[in-house]
Structures are given as structure tokens and as C-alpha cells.
From Swiss-Prot:
Source species of the chain: Arabidopsis thaliana
Catalysed reaction, written as an equation: a 2'-deoxyribonucleoside 5'-diphosphate + ATP = a 2'-deoxyribonucleoside 5'-triphosphate + ADP; a ribonucleoside 5'-diphosphate + ATP = a ribonucleoside 5'-triphosphate + ADP
Domain of life: Eukaryota
The protein's enzyme class: transferase
Family to which the UniProt record says this protein belongs: Belongs to the NDK family.
Ligand binding (ATP): K3, F51, R79, T85, R99, N109
GO BP terms in the entry: CTP biosynthetic process; GTP biosynthetic process; UTP biosynthetic process
Active site location: H112 (pros-phosphohistidine intermediate)
Protein name stated in the entry: Probable nucleoside diphosphate kinase 5
Amino acid sequence: MIKPDGVSGNYTEEIKTIVVEAGFNIVKEMLTQLDKETASAFYEEHSSRSFFPHLVTYMTSGPVLVMVLEKRNAVSDWRDLIGPTDAEKAKISHPHSIRALCGKNSQKNCVHGSDSTSSAEREIKFFFKDVVSGDIATQQHDEL
């Protein structure tokens, strides 16, 4: 997922180019504006964390581009491509990562990436109801 700062910062096409050049296939994509209820449901696992209200506010501050990516080892390769959560640290330790390119800090870090195959499956189904579970496991998709 390209977060609001990535979309509003006009990084969408650059990120998509990086994704394709890294060997991913963009299977599906959808530009959407999350409302509070949707953002809260998507990030439900973080609901007890102190940053949750700020995360929901941020994720509803502008449109996001949700994508389903396909590649062998998609989750781990995507995590490598986006870099560390904190964009400031990414600029030092992973200067060629997506978060180093367009992120600002640990929240406004431009992109979201599933942290596991099971998270990817849940997140893909959250936005793309027509993608069935077997397709995800077989084709090794990753929600972005």
C-alpha cells in the first residue's frame, strides 16, 4: 500500500516503477480513501497501542493506493525493498529503499507492507474480496 504521504507526494509512479523493476508483478491495484472505520479495522491489531489514534488519523488524511503484488518470496522481498519502518533510519541503513526515498519518519514512511504470509492473505482479502485464499498461497501474492 502506498500511504497518503506517498500518494500526495507524487511518489506513486516512481514506487510502481521500482516495484516492477524489482521483479514484482502488480496483479491488482485500487486507489481509495480510507474512512476512520476502515482504517481502524485494517490496523485493528494495533488498536491497543498508543500510536493507534494517530495512525488512523494519518491513514485517513488522503488517498492510498492498495496493490496486490506477485513474486516468489513476495513478502520477504517486499520487506527488503521497502526498508526499515523508520524512514530516518532507512536513509542511513538502507539508502536505496522505498522508505529512504520518500518517507519522513516511522509513521509517515510512504508504504505499508505485510509482515508475514498470513498477514498478506488477510490484508489482500480485506481490500480485494474477489481474491481467494488458494490463489494467494499458490501465487505468492503480497499486499502492499
